[in-house]
A protein has these predicted regions:
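Transmembrane alpha-helices and their membrane-interface boundaries in multi-pass membrane transporters
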Residues: 1-31, 150, 422, 456, ...
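Hydrophobic transmembrane alpha-helices and their membrane-interface caps
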Residues: 4, 398-485, 490-509, 518-522, ...
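Solvent-exposed, membrane-proximal periplasmic/extracellular interface segments of envelope transport
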Residues: 101-190, 216, 245-265
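Signature of alpha-helical transmembrane segments and their immediate interfacial
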Residues: 32-81, 107, 121
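Extracytoplasmic/periplasmic membrane-proximal domains and adjacent transmembrane bundles
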Residues: 208, 215-395, 399, 404-407, ...
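Short, hydrophobic beta-strand segments
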Residues: 86-96, 137-156, 189-209, 236-248, ...
Length: 544
Protein backbone atom coordinates (compact mmCIF):
# COMPACT_ATOMS: atom_id res chain seq x y z
CA UNK A 1 0.00 0.00 0.00
CA UNK A 2 2.77 2.43 0.89
CA UNK A 3 4.68 1.56 -2.27
CA UNK A 4 1.62 2.12 -4.45
CA UNK A 5 0.83 5.41 -2.70
CA UNK A 6 4.37 6.68 -3.19
CA UNK A 7 4.34 5.65 -6.85
CA UNK A 8 1.07 7.51 -7.46
CA UNK A 9 2.28 10.58 -5.57
CA UNK A 10 5.44 10.60 -7.69
CA UNK A 11 3.33 10.58 -10.86
CA UNK A 12 1.11 13.39 -9.56
CA UNK A 13 4.15 15.43 -8.53
CA UNK A 14 5.53 15.26 -12.08
CA UNK A 15 2.24 16.21 -13.73
CA UNK A 16 -0.05 18.15 -11.40
CA UNK A 17 2.57 20.24 -9.60
CA UNK A 18 3.91 21.93 -12.78
CA UNK A 19 0.35 22.41 -14.03
CA UNK A 20 -0.94 24.16 -10.92
CA UNK A 21 2.34 26.00 -10.50
CA UNK A 22 1.95 27.52 -13.95
CA UNK A 23 -1.54 28.76 -13.04
CA UNK A 24 -0.97 29.92 -9.50
CA UNK A 25 2.68 30.96 -9.13
CA UNK A 26 4.00 34.20 -10.55
CA UNK A 27 7.69 35.07 -10.69
CA UNK A 28 8.40 38.38 -9.00
CA UNK A 29 11.75 40.12 -9.20
CA UNK A 30 13.47 39.88 -5.83
CA UNK A 31 14.16 43.22 -4.21
CA UNK A 32 16.92 41.69 -2.09
CA UNK A 33 18.74 38.41 -1.52
CA UNK A 34 16.27 36.04 0.27
CA UNK A 35 19.18 34.42 2.11
CA UNK A 36 20.48 37.73 3.46
CA UNK A 37 18.75 37.35 6.83
CA UNK A 38 19.90 36.93 10.40
CA UNK A 39 18.93 33.24 10.44
CA UNK A 40 20.87 32.35 7.31
CA UNK A 41 23.91 34.39 8.37
CA UNK A 42 24.02 32.50 11.68
CA UNK A 43 23.59 29.21 9.85
CA UNK A 44 26.47 30.08 7.49
CA UNK A 45 28.73 30.71 10.48
CA UNK A 46 27.60 27.42 12.07
CA UNK A 47 28.22 25.46 8.87
CA UNK A 48 31.64 27.08 8.41
CA UNK A 49 32.59 26.03 11.93
CA UNK A 50 31.39 22.47 11.34
CA UNK A 51 33.40 22.24 8.12
CA UNK A 52 36.45 23.64 9.86
CA UNK A 53 36.24 21.04 12.66
CA UNK A 54 35.02 18.25 10.41
CA UNK A 55 36.75 15.33 12.11
CA UNK A 56 35.52 16.44 15.51
CA UNK A 57 31.98 16.56 14.12
CA UNK A 58 32.32 13.03 12.75
CA UNK A 59 33.67 11.78 16.08
CA UNK A 60 30.80 13.42 17.94
CA UNK A 61 28.17 11.89 15.65
CA UNK A 62 29.76 8.44 15.96
CA UNK A 63 29.75 8.81 19.75
CA UNK A 64 26.06 9.82 19.70
CA UNK A 65 25.26 6.84 17.49
CA UNK A 66 27.08 4.43 19.82
CA UNK A 67 25.33 5.97 22.83
CA UNK A 68 21.93 5.62 21.16
CA UNK A 69 22.56 1.93 20.46
CA UNK A 70 23.56 1.38 24.08
CA UNK A 71 20.45 3.17 25.35
CA UNK A 72 18.27 1.26 22.88
CA UNK A 73 19.42 -2.00 24.46
CA UNK A 74 18.31 -0.74 27.88
CA UNK A 75 14.90 0.52 26.78
CA UNK A 76 11.79 -1.60 27.49
CA UNK A 77 10.63 -3.66 24.55
CA UNK A 78 7.35 -5.37 23.82
CA UNK A 79 6.36 -7.43 20.80
CA UNK A 80 2.75 -6.31 20.32
CA UNK A 81 0.86 -3.70 22.38
CA UNK A 82 -2.47 -4.25 24.10
CA UNK A 83 -5.56 -2.87 22.40
CA UNK A 84 -7.35 0.11 23.93
CA UNK A 85 -10.70 -1.66 24.39
CA UNK A 86 -12.99 -2.13 27.44
CA UNK A 87 -12.53 -5.91 27.43
CA UNK A 88 -10.46 -8.54 29.10
CA UNK A 89 -10.54 -12.30 28.82
CA UNK A 90 -9.87 -15.07 31.30
CA UNK A 91 -8.82 -18.65 30.60
CA UNK A 92 -9.93 -21.05 33.33
CA UNK A 93 -8.15 -24.38 33.71
CA UNK A 94 -8.77 -27.08 36.30
CA UNK A 95 -6.31 -29.91 37.04
CA UNK A 96 -6.18 -32.78 34.55
CA UNK A 97 -8.74 -35.44 35.42
CA UNK A 98 -11.53 -33.02 36.35
CA UNK A 99 -14.72 -33.44 34.35
CA UNK A 100 -16.97 -30.92 32.63
CA UNK A 101 -19.31 -30.69 35.63
CA UNK A 102 -16.48 -29.47 37.86
CA UNK A 103 -15.63 -26.87 35.24
CA UNK A 104 -19.26 -25.75 35.00
CA UNK A 105 -19.57 -25.35 38.77
CA UNK A 106 -16.53 -23.07 39.00
CA UNK A 107 -17.51 -21.05 35.93
CA UNK A 108 -20.96 -20.38 37.39
CA UNK A 109 -19.39 -18.97 40.56
CA UNK A 110 -17.21 -16.62 38.53
CA UNK A 111 -20.05 -15.57 36.23
CA UNK A 112 -22.34 -14.72 39.16
CA UNK A 113 -19.62 -12.62 40.82
CA UNK A 114 -18.91 -10.74 37.58
CA UNK A 115 -22.59 -9.92 37.04
CA UNK A 116 -22.67 -8.37 40.52
CA UNK A 117 -19.97 -5.83 39.63
CA UNK A 118 -21.41 -2.45 38.53
CA UNK A 119 -18.52 -1.83 36.10
CA UNK A 120 -19.27 -5.00 34.09
CA UNK A 121 -21.51 -4.65 31.05
CA UNK A 122 -21.64 -8.18 29.59
CA UNK A 123 -20.15 -11.58 30.42
CA UNK A 124 -19.77 -14.41 27.88
CA UNK A 125 -18.81 -17.88 29.12
CA UNK A 126 -17.62 -20.78 26.97
CA UNK A 127 -17.07 -24.22 28.49
CA UNK A 128 -14.94 -27.06 27.15
CA UNK A 129 -13.08 -25.01 24.52
CA UNK A 130 -12.48 -21.47 23.32
CA UNK A 131 -15.41 -19.64 21.68
CA UNK A 132 -15.63 -19.08 17.92
CA UNK A 133 -13.05 -16.56 16.74
CA UNK A 134 -14.54 -13.19 17.67
CA UNK A 135 -11.52 -11.18 16.56
CA UNK A 136 -8.65 -12.01 14.22
CA UNK A 137 -5.88 -12.40 16.81
CA UNK A 138 -7.79 -14.68 19.17
CA UNK A 139 -6.18 -18.06 19.84
CA UNK A 140 -7.96 -21.42 19.91
CA UNK A 141 -7.75 -24.35 22.31
CA UNK A 142 -9.03 -27.81 21.40
CA UNK A 143 -11.79 -29.60 23.31
CA UNK A 144 -10.87 -30.10 26.98
CA UNK A 145 -13.39 -30.91 29.73
CA UNK A 146 -11.35 -29.01 32.31
CA UNK A 147 -11.13 -25.74 30.34
CA UNK A 148 -13.34 -22.66 30.20
CA UNK A 149 -13.13 -19.16 28.76
CA UNK A 150 -14.75 -15.95 30.00
CA UNK A 151 -15.02 -12.74 27.95
CA UNK A 152 -15.79 -9.64 30.05
CA UNK A 153 -16.93 -6.30 28.63
CA UNK A 154 -16.90 -3.20 30.83
CA UNK A 155 -18.56 0.18 30.53
CA UNK A 156 -15.25 2.09 30.62
CA UNK A 157 -11.77 1.10 29.41
CA UNK A 158 -10.16 2.81 32.42
CA UNK A 159 -11.86 0.35 34.78
CA UNK A 160 -10.46 -2.75 33.08
CA UNK A 161 -7.34 -3.32 35.17
CA UNK A 162 -9.10 -2.61 38.47
CA UNK A 163 -11.90 -5.11 37.77
CA UNK A 164 -9.39 -7.64 36.46
CA UNK A 165 -7.37 -7.46 39.68
CA UNK A 166 -10.49 -7.86 41.83
CA UNK A 167 -11.62 -10.81 39.73
CA UNK A 168 -8.24 -12.53 40.11
CA UNK A 169 -8.37 -12.03 43.88
CA UNK A 170 -11.90 -13.48 44.05
CA UNK A 171 -10.91 -16.60 42.09
CA UNK A 172 -7.88 -17.20 44.31
CA UNK A 173 -10.03 -16.95 47.45
CA UNK A 174 -13.09 -18.91 46.29
CA UNK A 175 -11.90 -21.37 43.61
CA UNK A 176 -8.72 -22.97 44.99
CA UNK A 177 -8.58 -25.70 42.33
CA UNK A 178 -8.71 -23.23 39.44
CA UNK A 179 -5.73 -21.95 37.49
CA UNK A 180 -6.72 -18.57 36.02
CA UNK A 181 -5.00 -16.52 33.36
CA UNK A 182 -6.55 -13.14 32.59
CA UNK A 183 -5.24 -10.83 29.88
CA UNK A 184 -6.11 -7.73 27.90
CA UNK A 185 -6.70 -7.94 24.18
CA UNK A 186 -3.55 -7.84 22.06
CA UNK A 187 -3.03 -7.32 18.36
CA UNK A 188 -1.24 -10.65 17.96
CA UNK A 189 -2.48 -14.11 18.95
CA UNK A 190 -1.65 -14.75 22.60
CA UNK A 191 0.44 -17.95 22.96
CA UNK A 192 -0.11 -20.46 25.76
CA UNK A 193 2.31 -18.37 27.83
CA UNK A 194 4.35 -15.24 27.25
CA UNK A 195 7.55 -17.06 28.28
CA UNK A 196 8.08 -20.74 27.48
CA UNK A 197 11.16 -22.96 27.72
CA UNK A 198 10.49 -26.27 25.98
CA UNK A 199 12.53 -29.40 26.76
CA UNK A 200 12.61 -31.94 23.93
CA UNK A 201 13.45 -35.62 24.37
CA UNK A 202 12.08 -39.15 24.70
CA UNK A 203 11.81 -40.07 28.38
CA UNK A 204 8.78 -38.57 30.12
CA UNK A 205 10.31 -38.65 33.62
CA UNK A 206 13.44 -36.86 32.41
CA UNK A 207 11.35 -34.20 30.69
CA UNK A 208 9.36 -33.66 33.89
CA UNK A 209 12.55 -33.35 35.91
CA UNK A 210 14.03 -30.74 33.54
CA UNK A 211 10.77 -28.81 33.36
CA UNK A 212 10.38 -28.84 37.13
CA UNK A 213 13.89 -27.42 37.52
CA UNK A 214 12.99 -24.57 35.16
CA UNK A 215 9.71 -23.98 37.04
CA UNK A 216 11.63 -23.75 40.34
CA UNK A 217 13.78 -20.99 38.82
CA UNK A 218 10.63 -19.16 37.71
CA UNK A 219 9.20 -19.36 41.24
CA UNK A 220 12.39 -17.81 42.63
CA UNK A 221 12.50 -15.00 40.05
CA UNK A 222 10.63 -11.78 40.99
CA UNK A 223 8.06 -10.54 38.49
CA UNK A 224 6.71 -13.91 37.31
CA UNK A 225 3.08 -15.03 37.37
CA UNK A 226 0.95 -18.00 36.25
CA UNK A 227 3.81 -20.52 36.56
CA UNK A 228 2.92 -24.00 35.24
CA UNK A 229 3.91 -26.59 32.63
CA UNK A 230 2.27 -27.54 29.36
CA UNK A 231 1.40 -31.13 30.35
CA UNK A 232 -0.34 -30.40 33.62
CA UNK A 233 -0.49 -32.80 36.55
CA UNK A 234 -0.36 -36.59 36.45
CA UNK A 235 -3.76 -38.29 36.67
CA UNK A 236 -4.69 -41.69 38.17
CA UNK A 237 -4.96 -44.13 35.28
CA UNK A 238 -6.53 -47.60 35.18
CA UNK A 239 -4.63 -49.73 32.64
CA UNK A 240 -6.01 -53.01 31.29
CA UNK A 241 -3.11 -55.23 30.15
CA UNK A 242 -4.23 -56.52 26.76
CA UNK A 243 -3.38 -60.17 26.04
CA UNK A 244 -2.78 -60.81 22.38
CA UNK A 245 -3.30 -64.55 22.81
CA UNK A 246 -6.64 -64.19 24.65
CA UNK A 247 -7.78 -61.46 22.30
CA UNK A 248 -7.11 -63.51 19.17
CA UNK A 249 -8.92 -66.49 20.66
CA UNK A 250 -12.17 -64.55 21.21
CA UNK A 251 -11.75 -62.12 18.29
CA UNK A 252 -11.17 -58.90 20.27
CA UNK A 253 -8.44 -56.55 19.05
CA UNK A 254 -6.64 -53.87 21.05
CA UNK A 255 -8.54 -51.09 19.22
CA UNK A 256 -11.90 -52.78 19.91
CA UNK A 257 -11.01 -52.98 23.59
CA UNK A 258 -10.14 -49.26 23.61
CA UNK A 259 -13.42 -48.50 21.84
CA UNK A 260 -15.35 -50.45 24.46
CA UNK A 261 -13.69 -48.51 27.29
CA UNK A 262 -14.55 -45.23 25.55
CA UNK A 263 -18.23 -46.26 25.18
CA UNK A 264 -18.45 -47.14 28.87
CA UNK A 265 -16.66 -44.07 30.21
CA UNK A 266 -17.09 -40.93 28.10
CA UNK A 267 -18.97 -42.03 24.99
CA UNK A 268 -17.75 -42.97 21.50
CA UNK A 269 -18.20 -40.23 18.87
CA UNK A 270 -20.12 -41.53 15.85
CA UNK A 271 -20.64 -38.27 14.00
CA UNK A 272 -22.23 -34.83 14.22
CA UNK A 273 -25.79 -33.55 14.11
CA UNK A 274 -26.31 -30.10 12.62
CA UNK A 275 -29.17 -27.83 13.61
CA UNK A 276 -28.91 -24.40 12.02
CA UNK A 277 -25.38 -23.20 12.66
CA UNK A 278 -24.92 -25.50 15.65
CA UNK A 279 -22.98 -28.79 15.50
CA UNK A 280 -23.70 -31.37 18.20
CA UNK A 281 -21.75 -34.63 18.58
CA UNK A 282 -23.53 -37.96 18.29
CA UNK A 283 -22.18 -40.21 21.06
CA UNK A 284 -22.62 -43.94 21.60
CA UNK A 285 -22.77 -44.51 25.38
CA UNK A 286 -23.36 -47.46 27.65
CA UNK A 287 -26.67 -46.95 29.47
CA UNK A 288 -24.92 -48.06 32.66
CA UNK A 289 -22.13 -45.50 32.24
CA UNK A 290 -22.71 -44.00 35.71
CA UNK A 291 -22.67 -47.39 37.42
CA UNK A 292 -19.05 -48.32 36.60
CA UNK A 293 -16.31 -47.83 39.18
CA UNK A 294 -13.00 -49.40 40.11
CA UNK A 295 -14.71 -52.44 41.61
CA UNK A 296 -16.59 -53.52 38.46
CA UNK A 297 -14.56 -52.10 35.56
CA UNK A 298 -13.32 -55.59 34.72
CA UNK A 299 -16.89 -56.41 33.63
CA UNK A 300 -16.96 -53.75 30.89
CA UNK A 301 -18.57 -55.19 27.74
CA UNK A 302 -16.54 -55.41 24.53
CA UNK A 303 -18.45 -55.76 21.25
CA UNK A 304 -16.98 -57.58 18.24
CA UNK A 305 -17.91 -57.10 14.55
CA UNK A 306 -19.53 -60.57 14.69
CA UNK A 307 -22.06 -59.24 17.21
CA UNK A 308 -20.69 -61.11 20.21
CA UNK A 309 -20.10 -59.50 23.60
CA UNK A 310 -17.21 -60.29 25.95
CA UNK A 311 -16.10 -58.74 29.19
CA UNK A 312 -12.83 -56.84 29.14
CA UNK A 313 -11.44 -59.32 31.66
CA UNK A 314 -11.56 -62.08 29.00
CA UNK A 315 -9.10 -60.18 26.74
CA UNK A 316 -6.56 -59.09 29.36
CA UNK A 317 -3.86 -60.48 31.62
CA UNK A 318 -4.91 -58.25 34.48
CA UNK A 319 -5.06 -54.57 35.35
CA UNK A 320 -2.68 -51.95 36.68
CA UNK A 321 -3.35 -48.66 38.44
CA UNK A 322 -0.77 -45.86 38.15
CA UNK A 323 -0.35 -42.10 37.72
CA UNK A 324 0.29 -40.93 34.17
CA UNK A 325 0.41 -37.66 32.31
CA UNK A 326 -3.02 -36.70 31.07
CA UNK A 327 -1.49 -34.68 28.22
CA UNK A 328 1.57 -35.46 26.09
CA UNK A 329 2.52 -32.80 23.54
CA UNK A 330 4.95 -33.06 20.65
CA UNK A 331 7.04 -30.71 18.54
CA UNK A 332 8.36 -31.97 15.20
CA UNK A 333 7.21 -35.48 16.22
CA UNK A 334 9.28 -35.37 19.43
CA UNK A 335 7.95 -35.10 22.97
CA UNK A 336 8.20 -31.58 24.32
CA UNK A 337 7.32 -30.32 27.78
CA UNK A 338 7.34 -26.58 28.42
CA UNK A 339 7.98 -24.61 31.59
CA UNK A 340 5.65 -21.64 31.28
CA UNK A 341 5.04 -18.31 32.99
CA UNK A 342 3.73 -14.81 32.32
CA UNK A 343 5.11 -11.48 33.48
CA UNK A 344 3.31 -9.86 36.38
CA UNK A 345 1.38 -6.70 35.55
CA UNK A 346 3.83 -3.87 34.91
CA UNK A 347 6.84 -6.16 34.32
CA UNK A 348 8.45 -5.99 30.88
CA UNK A 349 8.31 -9.33 29.07
CA UNK A 350 11.64 -9.03 27.27
CA UNK A 351 13.57 -8.10 30.41
CA UNK A 352 12.03 -10.96 32.39
CA UNK A 353 12.71 -13.39 29.55
CA UNK A 354 16.38 -12.38 29.38
CA UNK A 355 16.82 -12.93 33.12
CA UNK A 356 15.07 -16.32 33.05
CA UNK A 357 16.93 -17.52 29.96
CA UNK A 358 20.30 -16.87 31.56
CA UNK A 359 19.27 -18.60 34.80
CA UNK A 360 17.70 -21.64 33.10
CA UNK A 361 20.60 -22.09 30.68
CA UNK A 362 23.10 -21.94 33.53
CA UNK A 363 21.25 -24.01 36.15
CA UNK A 364 19.54 -26.75 34.09
CA UNK A 365 22.10 -29.10 32.47
CA UNK A 366 20.71 -31.07 29.54
CA UNK A 367 21.41 -34.82 29.32
CA UNK A 368 22.66 -36.27 26.06
CA UNK A 369 19.88 -36.49 23.50
CA UNK A 370 17.84 -33.66 25.03
CA UNK A 371 17.56 -30.06 23.91
CA UNK A 372 15.86 -26.83 24.96
CA UNK A 373 13.93 -24.49 22.67
CA UNK A 374 12.38 -21.11 23.37
CA UNK A 375 8.67 -20.75 22.60
CA UNK A 376 6.09 -18.11 23.56
CA UNK A 377 6.24 -14.46 22.53
CA UNK A 378 9.99 -14.65 21.97
CA UNK A 379 9.53 -17.29 19.27
CA UNK A 380 6.86 -15.17 17.55
CA UNK A 381 9.11 -12.12 17.70
CA UNK A 382 12.06 -14.00 16.24
CA UNK A 383 9.92 -15.31 13.39
CA UNK A 384 8.56 -11.84 12.58
CA UNK A 385 11.99 -10.19 12.79
CA UNK A 386 13.50 -12.91 10.62
CA UNK A 387 10.79 -12.40 8.01
CA UNK A 388 11.54 -8.66 7.95
CA UNK A 389 15.32 -9.12 7.89
CA UNK A 390 15.30 -11.83 5.22
CA UNK A 391 15.16 -9.38 2.31
CA UNK A 392 16.88 -6.45 4.00
CA UNK A 393 20.29 -7.06 2.31
CA UNK A 394 18.60 -7.22 -1.10
CA UNK A 395 16.69 -4.03 -0.30
CA UNK A 396 19.87 -2.12 0.59
CA UNK A 397 21.58 -3.39 -2.57
CA UNK A 398 18.67 -2.20 -4.72
CA UNK A 399 18.71 1.20 -2.98
CA UNK A 400 22.43 1.51 -3.68
CA UNK A 401 21.89 0.56 -7.34
CA UNK A 402 19.14 3.18 -7.74
CA UNK A 403 21.38 5.85 -6.19
CA UNK A 404 24.24 4.69 -8.41
CA UNK A 405 22.10 5.12 -11.52
CA UNK A 406 20.98 8.56 -10.31
CA UNK A 407 24.41 10.04 -9.54
CA UNK A 408 26.60 7.83 -11.80
CA UNK A 409 29.43 7.61 -9.28
CA UNK A 410 30.11 5.82 -6.03
CA UNK A 411 30.82 8.64 -3.63
CA UNK A 412 27.38 10.29 -3.55
CA UNK A 413 25.50 6.99 -2.85
CA UNK A 414 27.94 6.13 -0.06
CA UNK A 415 27.53 9.61 1.48
CA UNK A 416 23.74 9.24 1.40
CA UNK A 417 23.76 5.76 2.94
CA UNK A 418 26.04 6.97 5.73
CA UNK A 419 23.17 9.22 6.87
CA UNK A 420 20.97 6.22 7.72
CA UNK A 421 22.52 5.54 11.17
CA UNK A 422 21.54 9.06 12.23
CA UNK A 423 17.91 7.97 12.54
CA UNK A 424 18.74 5.76 15.56
CA UNK A 425 19.72 8.82 17.57
CA UNK A 426 16.30 10.37 17.01
CA UNK A 427 14.41 7.11 17.52
CA UNK A 428 15.87 6.64 20.99
CA UNK A 429 15.18 10.27 21.86
CA UNK A 430 11.58 10.07 20.60
CA UNK A 431 10.78 6.91 22.54
CA UNK A 432 12.44 8.21 25.70
CA UNK A 433 10.63 11.57 25.64
CA UNK A 434 7.18 10.07 24.95
CA UNK A 435 7.64 7.09 27.29
CA UNK A 436 6.76 4.55 24.59
CA UNK A 437 8.24 1.05 24.32
CA UNK A 438 9.97 -0.33 21.25
CA UNK A 439 7.63 -2.86 19.63
CA UNK A 440 6.80 -4.36 16.26
CA UNK A 441 5.18 -1.15 15.00
CA UNK A 442 8.25 0.82 16.06
CA UNK A 443 10.29 -1.51 13.88
CA UNK A 444 8.01 -0.81 10.92
CA UNK A 445 8.37 2.92 11.55
CA UNK A 446 12.14 2.51 11.71
CA UNK A 447 12.14 0.87 8.27
CA UNK A 448 10.02 3.70 6.89
CA UNK A 449 12.46 6.24 8.34
CA UNK A 450 15.24 4.80 6.19
CA UNK A 451 13.45 5.90 3.03
CA UNK A 452 12.49 9.30 4.45
CA UNK A 453 16.06 10.11 5.48
CA UNK A 454 17.46 8.94 2.14
CA UNK A 455 15.00 11.28 0.39
CA UNK A 456 16.24 14.28 2.41
CA UNK A 457 19.86 13.37 1.71
CA UNK A 458 19.20 12.96 -2.04
CA UNK A 459 17.63 16.45 -2.21
CA UNK A 460 20.72 18.03 -0.63
CA UNK A 461 23.36 16.05 -2.54
CA UNK A 462 21.62 16.64 -5.87
CA UNK A 463 21.50 20.40 -5.26
CA UNK A 464 25.23 20.43 -4.51
CA UNK A 465 25.86 18.69 -7.82
CA UNK A 466 23.63 21.13 -9.72
CA UNK A 467 25.47 24.17 -8.36
CA UNK A 468 28.87 22.64 -9.07
CA UNK A 469 27.77 21.89 -12.63
CA UNK A 470 26.78 25.55 -13.03
CA UNK A 471 30.38 26.55 -12.34
CA UNK A 472 30.37 27.39 -8.66
CA UNK A 473 33.39 26.47 -6.63
CA UNK A 474 33.13 23.29 -4.52
CA UNK A 475 33.03 25.10 -1.17
CA UNK A 476 30.57 27.79 -2.30
CA UNK A 477 28.36 25.16 -3.94
CA UNK A 478 28.36 23.11 -0.74
CA UNK A 479 27.39 26.07 1.45
CA UNK A 480 24.84 27.52 -0.99
CA UNK A 481 23.13 24.18 -1.60
CA UNK A 482 22.86 23.45 2.11
CA UNK A 483 21.49 26.94 2.75
CA UNK A 484 18.88 26.69 -0.03
CA UNK A 485 17.69 23.20 0.96
CA UNK A 486 17.00 23.97 4.63
CA UNK A 487 13.40 25.09 4.08
CA UNK A 488 12.35 22.33 1.60
CA UNK A 489 13.83 19.58 3.77
CA UNK A 490 12.37 21.08 6.95
CA UNK A 491 8.92 21.50 5.36
CA UNK A 492 8.85 17.92 4.07
CA UNK A 493 9.93 16.51 7.43
CA UNK A 494 7.72 18.87 9.42
CA UNK A 495 4.55 17.93 7.56
CA UNK A 496 5.32 14.24 8.09
CA UNK A 497 5.92 14.80 11.80
CA UNK A 498 2.66 16.73 12.18
CA UNK A 499 0.84 14.00 10.25
CA UNK A 500 2.02 11.46 12.83
CA UNK A 501 0.87 13.57 15.78
CA UNK A 502 -2.72 12.15 15.98
CA UNK A 503 -1.31 8.62 16.16
CA UNK A 504 1.01 9.46 19.05
CA UNK A 505 -1.78 8.95 21.60
CA UNK A 506 -3.07 5.69 20.11
CA UNK A 507 -2.34 2.53 22.09
CA UNK A 508 -1.54 0.53 18.95
CA UNK A 509 0.36 2.98 16.73
CA UNK A 510 1.70 5.37 19.38
CA UNK A 511 5.16 3.79 19.48
CA UNK A 512 5.41 3.90 15.67
CA UNK A 513 4.44 7.58 15.67
CA UNK A 514 7.04 8.38 18.36
CA UNK A 515 9.67 6.48 16.36
CA UNK A 516 8.95 8.36 13.13
CA UNK A 517 8.57 11.78 14.77
CA UNK A 518 11.72 11.59 16.88
CA UNK A 519 13.80 9.85 14.24
CA UNK A 520 12.80 12.22 11.45
CA UNK A 521 13.22 15.38 13.54
CA UNK A 522 16.74 14.58 14.75
CA UNK A 523 17.84 12.93 11.50
CA UNK A 524 16.73 16.00 9.51
CA UNK A 525 18.67 18.38 11.74
CA UNK A 526 21.75 16.18 11.69
CA UNK A 527 21.50 15.60 7.92
CA UNK A 528 21.55 19.33 7.19
CA UNK A 529 24.57 19.75 9.47
CA UNK A 530 26.47 16.47 9.06
CA UNK A 531 25.96 15.61 5.39
CA UNK A 532 27.93 18.69 4.17
CA UNK A 533 30.76 17.68 6.51
CA UNK A 534 30.87 14.11 5.15
CA UNK A 535 30.61 15.44 1.58
CA UNK A 536 33.55 17.77 2.22
CA UNK A 537 35.62 14.87 3.60
CA UNK A 538 34.88 12.61 0.60
CA UNK A 539 35.73 15.34 -1.94
CA UNK A 540 38.44 17.02 0.17
CA UNK A 541 36.69 20.39 -0.06
CA UNK A 542 38.16 23.24 1.93
CA UNK A 543 37.45 26.93 2.21
CA UNK A 544 39.50 28.79 -0.39
Amino acid sequence: MLGLSLLLSWGLALTQTPLFGDFMLRVKPAAHDPYDTKFYRKFDRLLAGLLRWRWGVVAGVVALFALSLAVMGLMPQNFFPSLDKPYFRADVLLPEGYNIRDTERNLRLMEEWLHEQPEVKTVSVTMGSTPPRYYLASSSISLRPNFGNILIELHDRKQTEEVENRFNAYVVANCPDVWLRSSLFKLSPVPDAAIEFGFIGDDIDTLRRLTQAAEDIMWRTPGTANIRNSWGNRVPTWLPLYSQMKGQRIGVTRSQMAQGITIATQGYRLGEYREGDQFMPILLKDENIDAYNLTNLQALPIFTPAGKVYSIEQATDGFRFEYRGGVVKRYNRQRVMKAQCDPARGVNTMELFAALRDSVTRAVPLPEGYSMKVFGEQESQQESNSALAEYMPLTMILIFIVLLLLFRNYREPVIILLMIPLIFIGVVLGLAVTGKVFNFFSLLGLLGLVGMNIKNAVVLVEQIGVLRAEGKGPYDALVSATRSRIVPVAMASGTTILGMLPLLFDSMFGAMAATIMGGLLVATLLTVCVLPVVYAIFYNIRES
